A protein has these predicted regions:
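Active-site neighborhood of glycoside hydrolase catalytic domains
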Residues: 140, 144-148, 154-164, 169-288, ...
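Boundary/entry segment of secreted carbohydrate-active catalytic domains
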Residues: 1-20, 24, 250-253, 309-310
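Active-site-adjacent "subsite" loops/lids of carbohydrate-active enzymes
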Residues: 11-12, 66-155
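Hydrophobic faces of well-ordered beta-strands that scaffold small-molecule active sites
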Residues: 2-6, 32-34, 64-68, 161-164, ...
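Aromatic-lined substrate-binding rim segments of carbohydrate-active enzymes
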Residues: 21, 34-72, 221-240
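Catalytic domains of carbohydrate-active enzymes, especially glycoside hydrolases
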Residues: 16-40, 155-160, 267, 271-279, ...
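Substrate-binding cleft of secreted/luminal carbohydrate-active enzymes
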Residues: 273-292, 300-360
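The substrate-binding groove and active-site-proximal loops of carbohydrate-active enzymes
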Residues: 2-11, 41-47, 128-146, 214-226, ...
């Protein structure tokens, strides 16, 4: 696979789509990861950029994978304009950071103040979180995400679905009242009576007693919710279109992914819960990172995500070569729009094609 991530901003007109498809094709790419926002499902449009992209790409012999944000439902910058967006309709689904949990607990979840405080905290901590996330621990939120995937795969003849942001932003997230209640209810059915009574007595003074007292179980619970979501999304996509290839963005370091983001991608690979892993590799030791992934991927294909927007043309070509040496079955470059814009320009992609894909 030789793929490009393509942002929505590159799909605004038929002509911009034509230029993008032509540029990708002539540069030797064979796949497009096309960004589709959460609001796209079911939206009424006079011009359908996704449908037009698929038509033009398939005509040119390119495959198209839908690039979907999953748990992250809104970026931390400009909030969605539409008032029927999930963050306004269901603020109770949003993950709450541990640092804000006690402050939000007495606030009515449906009051503007609740969402306002969460947004302000998110914007003041952009080094830790890049937006608003829904909790996979809540059945309604998981169903919402599954239905969004179902609708997109049903509407479009996609070749694949790339699931982005299938993770917790950090290990100290998802301390909302409903997520903690779900964990508490599960643990109450498993704990010996005396231990349950002890923690219940602590909870009378500390509403976060269950995650505090059962820290490892709390981590395992959230990790399991994320894994269950991955399984459900893949099953949903394939139930609509069996040939759909489902890939997942993963943190390249498996231990860090599990520790910091509760993203147990080794289990996903070992149990064939996904069709392909897509780690974003950074830094000088690309070969080392990808060799580790190859060793842990349990035979699952993996595609190296390369941030070419931060690299020179030579560095990008070298990164592609390193990915191939490490056993990657494909590469995905970030991103079309940044690679054709100044200071790079249109020759950047064609140069990569000549340097990395000649003879492919």
């Amino acid at each position: 696979m030789r793929a490009l991530w393509v942002r929505q901003t590159s799909l605004e007109t038929e002509e911009s789509i034509r230029r993008m498809v032509a540029s990708a094709s002539t540069s030797g790419f064979n796949t497009l990861f096309v960004q589709i926002g959460n609001e796209a499902a079911g939206a009424a449009q006079t011009f359908d950029p996704v449908g037009e992209t698929i038509n033009q790409a398939h005509t040119a012999g390119l495959r198209v994978h839908a690039w979907l944000d999953i748990a992250r439902v809104a970026p931390s910058g400009e909030l969605p304009f539409a008032r029927d967006h999930v963050i306004y309709q269901h603020p109770e689904w949003l993950m709450v950071p541990r640092a804000l949990a006690a402050e939000l607990l007495p606030v009515d979840v449906h009051s503007p103040d609740y969402l306002g405080r969460l947004v302000r905290w998110t914007r003041s901590n952009t080094d830790r979180i890049d937006g608003l996330y829904v909790s996979p621990a809540l059945p309604e939120a998981a169903s919402y995400l599954a239905e969004a995937v179902r609708d997109i795969v049903r509407r479009y003849p996609l070749d694949g679905v790339y699931l982005d942001h299938v993770r917790y932003p950090a290990a100290d997230f998802d301390y909302g009242a409903r997520s903690i209640a779900a964990f508490r209810d599960m643990m109450r059915g498993q704990l010996p009576l005396t231990e349950r009574q002890r923690i219940d007595s602590v909870q009378a003074l500390d509403p976060f007693a269950y995650p505090n007292e059962l820290a490892e179980e709390w981590r395992s619970f959230r990790r399991a919710q994320l894994t269950a979501l991955v399984v459900r999304l893949r099953s949903t996509a394939k139930s609509v279109r069996p040939g759909t290839v489902v890939s997942v963005a993963v943190t390249s370091d498996a231990e860090s992914a599990e520790r910091e983001n509760l993203q147990d991608w080794r289990t996903w690979a070992a149990n064939e819960f996904i069709d392909a892993l897509c780690p974003m590799v950074t830094g000088a030791d690309v070969t080392g990172q990808l060799s580790q992934i190859h060793a842990l991927a349990a035979g699952r294909p993996f595609w190296a995500g390369i941030g070419a927007n931060r690299l020179s043309q030579r560095e990008t070509i070298d990164g592609i070569a390193a990915a191939r040496r490490a056993g990657a079955q494909g590469i995905v470059l970030f991103s079309y729009d940044s690679l054709i814009s100044p200071p790079k320009g249109s020759e950047f992609l064609t140069g990569i094609g000549r340097g990395a894909f000649a003879g492919s």
